[in-house]
Amino acid sequence: MNSIEFPLLNQTTQNSVISTTSNDLSNWSRLSSLWPLLYGTSCCFIEFASLIGSRFDFDRYGLVPRSSPRQADLILTAGTVTMKMAPSLVRLYEQMPEPKYVIAMGACTITGGMFSTDSYSTVRGVDKLIPVDVYLPGCPPKPEAVIDAITKLRKKVSREIYEDRVGSQQETRCFTINHKFRVGRSTHTGNYDQGLLYQSPSISEIPYENETFLKYKIAVSSHKLVN
């Protein structure tokens, strides 16, 4: 059995029979076979490649790297994401079947890193494009930190409830526990809010300089006649 604890797990009745729920059984099967899609763009991905060797042996977690997003349920982004690469990353995420998860690995992926300083072509955080489940800081993170991030993601999967996940998918585009998205008004429809635009004052509100000057001149003339 997996070492992950389930909150809804009942007591063991016999040595070969375990009483549990279908939701916990589904979560256990998914966390034991996470298939990641590796999206590496810079040096952070080299640290993840060291997990393939026998020293860390990431096969013990059921990780099977896939080259197609349609066969993956986890995308691991490592490295800088540029504006030109952003549409491709979002397209890969949308092609992944539900439920799906994201691990942001490295400072360049989380905040843009040193490449985002005074740069117009770098995305300052991958969470501006896709929802992130686990943040993994470091430049670059150690392989032990990657294993810890995967362990935290497995614990998160074990606590998910199917009804909450389905209800959230009906309201928003994606589901995560850390991020609470809400449907907002689109700003790229071409229709701008007229209240935010500059409105020039009407002609009646503009004071006429000649009219003011004539009133002043008439007042001065009448004052002289009285004297």
From Swiss-Prot:
Membrane topology designation: Peripheral membrane protein
Pfam families with a match to the protein in the record: Oxidored_q6 (PF01058)
Catalytic reaction list: a plastoquinone + NADH + (n+1) H(+)(in) = a plastoquinol + NAD(+) + n H(+)(out); a plastoquinone + NADPH + (n+1) H(+)(in) = a plastoquinol + NADP(+) + n H(+)(out)
GO molecular function terms attached to this record: 4 iron, 4 sulfur cluster binding; iron ion binding; NADH dehydrogenase (ubiquinone) activity; quinone binding
Domain of life: Eukaryota
Gene Ontology biological-process annotations: aerobic respiration; electron transport coupled proton transport; photosynthesis, light reaction
Coiled coil residues, start to end: none
Swiss-Prot/TrEMBL cofactor(s): [4Fe-4S] cluster
Cellular component annotations (GO), alphabetically ordered: chloroplast thylakoid membrane; respiratory chain complex I
Cofactor binding description: Binds 1 [4Fe-4S] cluster.
Enzyme Commission number(s) of this protein: 7.1.1.-
UniProt keyword terms in alphabetical order: 4Fe-4S, Chloroplast, Iron, Iron-sulfur, Membrane, Metal-binding, NAD, NADP, Plastid, Plastoquinone, Quinone, Thylakoid, Translocase, Transport
Ligand binding ([4Fe-4S] cluster): C43, C44, C108, C139
UniProt subunit comment: NDH is composed of at least 16 different subunits, 5 of which are encoded in the nucleus.
HAMAP family: NDH1_NuoB (MF_01356)
Family: Belongs to the complex I 20 kDa subunit family.
Function: NDH shuttles electrons from NAD(P)H:plastoquinone, via FMN and iron-sulfur (Fe-S) centers, to quinones in the photosynthetic chain and possibly in a chloroplast respiratory chain. The immediate electron acceptor for the enzyme in this species is believed to be plastoquinone. Couples the redox reaction to proton translocation, and thus conserves the redox energy in a proton gradient.
NCBIfam families: nuoB_fam, PRK06411.1
Name of the protein in question: NAD(P)H-quinone oxidoreductase subunit K, chloroplastic
Source species of the chain: Ranunculus macranthus (Large buttercup)
Gene from which the chain derives: ndhK
